[in-house]
């Protein structure tokens, strides 16, 4: 069982990273917020979990052990595959996820592409008694970076690119994804917050 990877970052892709460990390059699917912290040529240590399939083994990387635990919980829910589980982990931090489940907010879960009402309700039912371990007890939202927002000209292009890539990976058209990511980033916040804001905007446009 591979628990973590430590080595040089060889490549940071759309939704994955390649890290060289003892001469072997390991590719792991990762969230936009984690990918945003990794730089090619730098040394990094990431936590991973393995998903064994009939035709191979996939690695998924996480920023924290709590996020990895959350992924494992989601994978135990019927109908939630690794792609959907990773999409949820990419958008919600563990404490945010705990509040969503506790509040039975299936609408928030349905903002994640591929999660319908029935699956969202099943996630809530199956995990409601298990997510207390993630609840920090702080009901306040995360501090916003760039309070008061920024003009679109001042928006960090790297953040916009990361969020755009995440939206494209989730199945949204690139042009629409970039426009929405730029607008969402103008309000400030972390990559995770901006991604959630963009998803809400794109979901409302579809309705």
Curated annotation (Swiss-Prot):
Chain positions covered by the region annotation Domain III: 155-207
Signal sequence interval, chain numbering: none
Biological source species: Corynebacterium kroppenstedtii (strain DSM 44385 / JCM 11950 / CIP 105744 / CCUG 35717)
InterPro entries in the record: DNA_helicase_Holl-junc_RuvA_I (IPR013849), Hlx-hairpin-Hlx_DNA-bd_motif (IPR003583), NA-bd_OB-fold (IPR012340), RuvA (IPR000085), RuvA_2-like (IPR010994), RuvA_C (IPR011114), RuvA_C_sf (IPR036267)
Physiological role: The RuvA-RuvB-RuvC complex processes Holliday junction (HJ) DNA during genetic recombination and DNA repair, while the RuvA-RuvB complex plays an important role in the rescue of blocked DNA replication forks via replication fork reversal (RFR). RuvA specifically binds to HJ cruciform DNA, conferring on it an open structure. The RuvB hexamer acts as an ATP-dependent pump, pulling dsDNA into and through the RuvAB complex. HJ branch migration allows RuvC to scan DNA until it finds its consensus sequence, where it cleaves and resolves the cruciform DNA.
Primary site of residence: cytoplasm
Cell location: Cytoplasm
Annotated region (Domain I), positions in chain: 1-63
GO MF annotation: an example: ATP binding
Keywords of this entry: Cytoplasm, DNA damage, DNA recombination, DNA repair, DNA-binding
Gene Ontology biological-process annotations: DNA recombination; DNA repair
GO CC aspect terms: cytoplasm; Holliday junction helicase complex; Holliday junction resolvase complex
Region (Flexible linker): 143-154
Annotated domain remarks: Has three domains with a flexible linker between the domains II and III and assumes an 'L' shape. Domain III is highly mobile and contacts RuvB.
Keyword DNA damage belongs to the record: yes
Protein family according to the UniProt entry: Belongs to the RuvA family.
Region (Domain II): 64-142
Quaternary organization: Homotetramer. Forms an RuvA(8)-RuvB(12)-Holliday junction (HJ) complex. HJ DNA is sandwiched between 2 RuvA tetramers; dsDNA enters through RuvA and exits via RuvB. An RuvB hexamer assembles on each DNA strand where it exits the tetramer. Each RuvB hexamer is contacted by two RuvA subunits (via domain III) on 2 adjacent RuvB subunits; this complex drives branch migration. In the full resolvosome a probable DNA-RuvA(4)-RuvB(12)-RuvC(2) complex forms which resolves the HJ.
Protein name as it appears in the record: Holliday junction branch migration complex subunit RuvA
